[in-house]
Structures are given as structure tokens and as C-alpha cells.
């Protein structure tokens, strides 16, 4: 262990220096007449940015109906990321990226724009010309090119800082001290088992004199049964208690469950699925984050599935998998049912957190002389 520390520590310092150089000369561009809220993290791997962005969209759609909403994303691994694009629908994840496609599918009336150069992509593709406009910058904490009015940083309660070291010695994308740039921190995936880790992380922030307010959140998980005959974008959803009563997920009525996923934190997906079903899932295949499922790979998954087994995957994976006609036809042919794990964020300190969000809107309106227009 000591050998690896000695080997990688200089590389970790070099990474920090190169990161500092890359950020030093950037002067953030102020997007005209919009309220910009960034959702980001400081670690590699999944912290729950996608469901948290969706939580914010739901909140603002419910509480600030006069506001138009834009989700601005890089579109990681998307074919059109380099040139930038605006999404018309969520049916082409290979062009626009899996998370942006998932956002557009879930919120058809929300403007979703992708681009490696997010500033230029927004200026080119934005079709909203109202001052009542909220832009949510997805994975934006390290993206200093765009000025943001508020920075929300997510920390996974299972391991907020990893080993406390930056890449490649650890999982941090930048040092813990950089959290001073954040306006608030939200610990995600909180459970009774990892609560102590979040408390220790808060103490570390206090020791480092980082006076950033923090909140906690957990996931509300559900399963959605896919109708393989229609493949509608809004499949029938069953509450957890109803799912447990169906023959489909009755352990006596099938030969088990097979989970496949390509996300940043597959272990947490597995634990979530097991908590919904109420039993252990022994069959699973994990793929790299943003994995593009080919028909051959999906065919090999079907080859491992016994008759009566229920397939499980995530919303992020389903956005891509549903376009594979050969796979879907084989599922129908073999009468294999597939369920999608649906995740929603619940902020534990809901009243305080939503009061903060309401304050952001009020401050923005006062700053831009919009109060009289309400």
C-alpha cells in the first residue's frame, strides 16, 4: 500500500497542478437574463446527479410555473457533443447522450441542450427568450466557463471523499478545500448504515474551515414494468407494495432476477433493487458507465437468462436498450419481462432546502427587476 502511495502521490500533485492551470485563466461567462444553478460533485463515480437534476426540475415546475427550464449538459460520449445540439425528443441517446435523453423523455416541455462547449451551445441553440428562465447546469462544478448563481455539490454518503486523495491516488476530482466554492452541499443516498460517514465528512469540512451549509437526501425507489408490445415512453408504473404482490415478482412464480446496468455506481443500483424486491439478486452483469449496449452484448445477457427470470435495469440504461429491436423481439419471443428501476430524490430537510431555492428565485427577480412583472 505504501509503495502505491509513493508511486502515485507525485502524479496526484501533478493532476492538481494541471487542474489549477486549466481553471486559472477562465473568466466565467454570464448567460444573459437567466438564473443558473449548477449541480456537480468532487468525486469520480455516481453521486446521483441525474435524479437530483430531475428533483430540481420537478420543484421549479411545481413552484415557479411561469419559469421556463433548460437543462444544459455536456452530453458525455454523445455523437453531437462536439458541435452541440438541442434535443427534440429522448429517442436518440447515441446522438445526445443517455442522461440528456432521459431528461427529455421525462420532461418533454423542458429545453435540453448539450455541448462540450456549453456556453457556445447555449447561445446557439437556446430558444427561450424570457427573463423567467432557469438553467440547470448538469455536472457543472468543474465547468467554470459559465457563471452560476448557485453551486450545489453532491457527496455520496457511502464515501463522501473516498480516501481523501485526488486522482490517480484517490477518487477526488479536486481537493476537498475547493468545496469553498460551493454554496451548499447535499449528501445523497443517506441510510441508517452510512449516516455516521456523512457526520464525519461534516466534521472534516469544519476542521478545514469550509463554512458551507449541508443537507441530506435519500432515494425513493420504484419499479416500472415495460410493456414490450407498445414500448410507450410512459409505461405502466406499479407502486412497490403492488409489485411485491404480483406474480411477476413472486419468488415462487419465477426463477429469480437478472440485473444489468452501466452506471457510475452499480453496487448501489444492486442494493436498491434488492431493497425493492426484498430478496437477494445473485445474477447480475455490470458494465462501464455510459456503456453503449450492442445487440451482441444484449444477446449474451439473454443467453444467461432462464425461462421465468425477470430482467432489471435502470432508467439510464433503458433509454439506450429500448432502441435495440433484436433484443426486444427476443424478450417477447421468450416471454421475458423487464422492469426499470425508477429513482426519485427526497431531501430530508425539505422545508429548509425548498426555502433556500425559493430565496434564489426571489433574489434573481429582485436583481433583474422582475418583481413587478409577477
Curated annotation (Swiss-Prot):
Q: Which UniProt keywords apply?
A: ATP-binding, Kinase, Lipid A biosynthesis, Lipid biosynthesis, Lipid metabolism, Nucleotide-binding, Transferase
Which residues are listed for ATP binding in this entry?
43-50
Entry-linked Pfam families = LpxK
Its BP terms in the Gene Ontology are: lipid A biosynthetic process; lipopolysaccharide core region biosynthetic process
Q: Which GO terms describe its molecular function?
A: ATP binding; tetraacyldisaccharide 4'-kinase activity
Q: Identify the EC number(s).
A: 2.7.1.130
Which EC class is this protein assigned?
Answer: transferase
Top-level taxon of the source organism: Bacteria
Listed InterPro entries: LpxK
What Gene Ontology cellular component terms go with this record? plasma membrane
Q: In which pathway does it act?
A: Glycolipid biosynthesis; lipid IV(A) biosynthesis; lipid IV(A) from (3R)-3-hydroxytetradecanoyl-[acyl-carrier-protein] and UDP-N-acetyl-alpha-D-glucosamine: step 6/6
Question: Which reaction is the catalytic activity of this chain?
Answer: a lipid A disaccharide + ATP = a lipid IVA + ADP + H(+)
Function text: Transfers the gamma-phosphate of ATP to the 4'-position of a tetraacyldisaccharide 1-phosphate intermediate (termed DS-1-P) to form tetraacyldisaccharide 1,4'-bis-phosphate (lipid IVA).
Q: Which NCBIfam families match?
A: lpxK
* UniProt record similarity statement: Belongs to the LpxK family.
This chain's protein is named Tetraacyldisaccharide 4'-kinase
The scientific name of the source species is Leptospira biflexa serovar Patoc (strain Patoc 1 / ATCC 23582 / Paris)
Species classification: Bacteria, Pseudomonadati, Spirochaetota, Spirochaetia, Leptospirales
Amino acid at each position: 500500500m505504501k509503495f502505491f502511495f509513493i508511486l502515485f502521490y507525485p502524479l496526484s500533485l501533478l493532476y492538481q497542478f494541471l487542474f489549477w492551470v486549466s481553471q486559472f485563466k477562465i473568466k466565467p461567462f454570464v448567460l444573459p437574463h437567466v438564473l443558473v444553478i449548477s449541480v456537480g460533485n468532487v468525486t469520480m463515480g455516481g453521486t446521483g446527479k441525474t435524479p437530483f437534476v430531475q428533483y430540481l426540475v420537478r420543484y421549479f415546475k411545481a413552484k415557479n410555473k411561469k419559469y421556463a427550464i433548460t437543462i444544459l449538459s455536456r452530453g458525455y460520449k454523445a455523437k453531437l457533443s462536439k458541435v452541440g445540439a438541442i434535443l427534440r425528443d429522448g429517442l436518440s441517446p447515441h446522438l445526445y447522450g443517455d442522461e440528456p435523453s432521459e431528461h427529455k423523455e421525462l420532461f418533454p416541455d423542458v429545453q435540453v441542450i448539450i455541448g462540450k462547449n456549453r456556453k457556445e451551445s447555449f447561445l446557439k441553440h437556446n430558444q427561450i427568450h424570457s427573463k423567467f428562465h432557469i438553467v440547470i447546469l448538469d455536472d457543472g462544478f468543474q465547468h467554470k466557463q459559465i457563471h452560476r448563481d448557485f453551486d450545489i455539490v453532491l457527496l455520496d454518503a457511502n464515501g463522501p471523499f473516498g480516501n481523501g486523495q485526488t486522482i490517480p491516488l484517490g477518487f477526488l476530482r479536486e481537493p476537498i478545500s475547493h468545496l469553498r466554492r460551493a454554496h451548499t452541499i447535499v449528501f445523497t443516498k443517506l441510510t441508517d448504515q452510512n449516516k455516521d460517514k456523512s457526520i464525519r465528512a461534516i466534521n472534516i469540512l469544519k476542521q478545514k474551515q469550509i463554512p458551507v451549509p449541508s443537507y441530506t437526501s435519500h432515494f425513493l425507489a420504484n419499479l416500472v414494468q415495460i410493456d414490450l408490445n407498445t414500448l410507450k415512453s410512459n409505461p405502466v408504473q406499479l407502486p412497490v407494495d403492488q409489485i411485491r404482490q404480483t406474480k411477476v415478482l413472486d419468488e415462487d412464480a419465477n426463477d429469480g432476477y437478472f440485473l444489468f446496468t452501466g452506471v457510475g455506481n452499480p453496487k448501489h443500483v444492486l442494493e436498491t433493487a434488492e431493497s425493492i424486491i426484498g430478496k437477494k439478486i445473485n445474477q447480475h452483469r455490470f458494465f462501464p458507465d455510459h456503456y453503449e449496449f450492442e445487440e451482441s452484448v444484449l444477446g449474451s445477457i439473454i443467453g444467461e437468462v432462464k425461462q421465468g427470470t425477470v430482467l432489471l435495469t435502470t432508467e439510464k440504461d433503458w433509454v439506450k436498450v429500448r432502441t435495440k429491436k433484436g433484443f426486444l423481439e427476443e424478450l417477447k419471443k421468450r416471454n421475458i419481462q423487464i422492469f426499470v428501476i425508477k429513482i426519485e430524490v427526497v431531501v430530508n430537510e425539505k422545508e429548509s432546502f425548498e426555502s433556500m431555492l425559493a430565496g434564489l428565485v426571489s433574489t434573481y427577480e429582485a436583481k433583474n427587476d422582475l418583481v413587478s412583472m409577477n
